[in-house]
């Protein structure tokens, strides 16, 4: 009868596949493997070689006799240890016929392989010889010259060497500030990336990231919220979304105590304290705290409008504008004014609106003393004093202090007339012209112009 190979009875995963499993699937895997170990122990089988390099994809091994220990530490020439990389929880004290891992340094038992790795490191100060993805130690710490073979070692070493660019490429010596950066850089030495999108050409070094990206083209959203039914393409997105229902905000600002549901939001918020604005508009030089803000702003220069209202067809530059606009049609919004019933999507917009009722104007101009209810109106006013005109026409060179004036001016070049009269079909480039025209049909005469030949339309600048 042929000898039994471990691969015949084991369920194998790649590292990326293991990362994609949810906790219940991982628990099921551990239960199955635990039962497998029990069965093998009961029939008197053991692995001859415990020096397994890959933590999940275990190569074919013959099983020949009863184990004294299924996990065994083997001390290397320089104090490095190698271990069977089986996930913690498969082997434990409750598994009959199986002895858990034992430390070669102090003799302590009762640990899983990963726990033993940490335990040995605490004794020796050295990293275990972990999983090798490409067959050599490609990443080094430039502060201490230490070679690290597997990216999970880095967060531990990160705390040892704060500041600077801690990741050093052994191939060319270039240094990097983050692990993500050096992983991308290593692709240049490996001759490109293994996973490339056929639709847009974007490349990925991990299949899990590639599969998530593909869903942006297919529209697949396998993760659905049980509370509201909203679907997501990635498991991390649904976890963040679920916090809107639970109210969980695990990320708290150390400066002001404000809490956030997502790490991305707190990083953006922290810039309000530091004053950091890393995203700059190439057209006018205006800086922003987050990438989405600069992208929305850049559309004021290009005139690009990606979003269209399904109700009225109005084109808008960003998703936030669409949400705000849709409230006009639906009348629904999480923040509703008790005085006039107007609804808002964001608390900041709601607070600004409330000031129209209270008369509060917290922003004072130091030049002329004029006060404003919101910071954006105040900034626009300041340009009257400074003469700043950040919006410049690429066609004729004329500059404007406000983006709205700039967009209106652009229509003189493009011929665009977005305001059309439903009565007679006549179109206009500006809403003021359109409103004046409508009164011809209604017969309304709200004011009388003493000089009919004079223009009543304000000059844009």
From Swiss-Prot:
Zinc finger map (C2H2-type): 99-123, 167-189, 195-217, 223-245, 251-273, 279-301, 307-329, 335-357, 363-385, 391-413, 419-441
Domain KRAB intervals: 4-80
Top-level taxon: Eukaryota
InterPro entries reported in the protein's UniProt record: KRAB, KRAB_dom_sf, Znf_C2H2_sf, Znf_C2H2_type
Gene3D superfamilies associated with the record: 6.10.140.140, Classic Zinc Finger
Any one GO MF annotation of this record: RNA polymerase II transcription regulatory region sequence-specific DNA binding
One GO term (biological process): regulation of transcription by RNA polymerase II
Subcellular location: Nucleus
GO cellular component, one term: nucleus
CDD domains from the UniProt entry: KRAB_A-box
Keywords: DNA-binding, Isopeptide bond, Metal-binding, Nucleus, Repeat, Transcription, Transcription regulation, Ubl conjugation, Zinc, Zinc-finger
Tagged with keyword Transcription regulation: yes
Cross-link (Glycyl lysine isopeptide (Lys-Gly) (interchain with G-Cter in SUMO2)): 99, 439
Pfam families in alphabetical order: KRAB, zf-C2H2
Free-text function comment from the UniProt entry: May be involved in transcriptional regulation.
Family: Belongs to the krueppel C2H2-type zinc-finger protein family.
Name listed for the protein in its UniProt record: Zinc finger protein 627
Species this protein is from: Homo sapiens (Human)
Biological classification of the source: Eukaryota, Metazoa, Chordata, Craniata, Vertebrata
Name of the coding gene: ZNF627
């Amino acid at each position: 009868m042929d000898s039994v190979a471990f691969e015949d009875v084991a369920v194998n995963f790649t590292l990326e596949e293991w990362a994609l499993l949810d906790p219940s699937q991982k628990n099921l895997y551990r239960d199955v493997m635990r039962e497998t170990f029990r069965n093998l122990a009961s029939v008197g089988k053991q692995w001859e070689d415990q020096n397994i390099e890959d933590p999940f994809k275990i190569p074919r091994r013959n099983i020949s006799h009863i184990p004294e220990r299924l996990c065994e530490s083997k001390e290397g020439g320089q104090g490095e240890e190698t271990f069977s990389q089986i996930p913690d929880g498969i082997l434990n004290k409750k598994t009959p016929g199986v002895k858990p891992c034992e430390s070669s340094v102090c003799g302590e038992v009762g640990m899983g392989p990963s726990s033993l790795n940490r335990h040995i490191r605490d004794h020796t100060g050295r990293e275990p010889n972990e999983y090798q993805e490409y067959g050599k130690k490609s990443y080094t710490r430039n502060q201490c010259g230490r070679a690290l073979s597997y990216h999970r070692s880095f967060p531990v070493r990160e705390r040892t060497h704060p500041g600077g660019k801690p990741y050093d490429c052994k191939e060319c010596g270039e240094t990097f500030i983050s692990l993500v950066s050096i992983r991308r850089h290593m692709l240049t030495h490996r001759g490109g990336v293994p996973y490339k999108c056929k639709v847009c050409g974007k490349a990925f070094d991990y299949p899990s990231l590639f599969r998530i990206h593909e869903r942006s083209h297919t529209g697949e959203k396998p993760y659905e919220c049980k509370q509201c039914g909203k679907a997501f393409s990635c498991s991390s997105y649904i976890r963040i979304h679920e916090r809107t229902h639970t109210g969980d905000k695990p990320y708290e600002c150390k400066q002001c105590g404000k809490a956030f549901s997502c790490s991305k939001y707190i990083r953006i918020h922290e810039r309000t304290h530091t004053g950091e604005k890393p995203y700059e508009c190439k057209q006018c030089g205006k800086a922003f705290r987050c990438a989405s803000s600069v992208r929305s702003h850049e559309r004021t220069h290009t005139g690009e409008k990606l979003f269209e209202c399904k109700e009225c067809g109005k084109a808008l530059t960003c998703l936030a504008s669409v949400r705000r606009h849709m409230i006009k049609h639906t009348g629904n919004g999480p923040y509703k004014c008790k005085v006039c019933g107007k609804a808002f999507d964001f608390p900041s917009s709601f607070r600004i609106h409330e000031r129209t009722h209270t008369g509060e104007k917290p922003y004072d101009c130091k030049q002329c003393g004029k006060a404003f209810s919101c910071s954006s109106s105040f900034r626009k006013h300041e340009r009257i004093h400074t003469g700043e005109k950040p919006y410049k026409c690429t066609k004729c060179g004329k500059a404007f202090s406000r983006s709205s004036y700039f967009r209106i001016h652009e229509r003189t070049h493009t011929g665009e007339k977005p305001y059309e009269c439903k009565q007679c079909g006549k179109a206009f480039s500006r809403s003021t012209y359109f409103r004046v025209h409508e009164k011809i049909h209604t017969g309304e005469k709200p004011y009388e112009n003493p000089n009919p030949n004079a223009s009543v339309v304000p000059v844009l600048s």
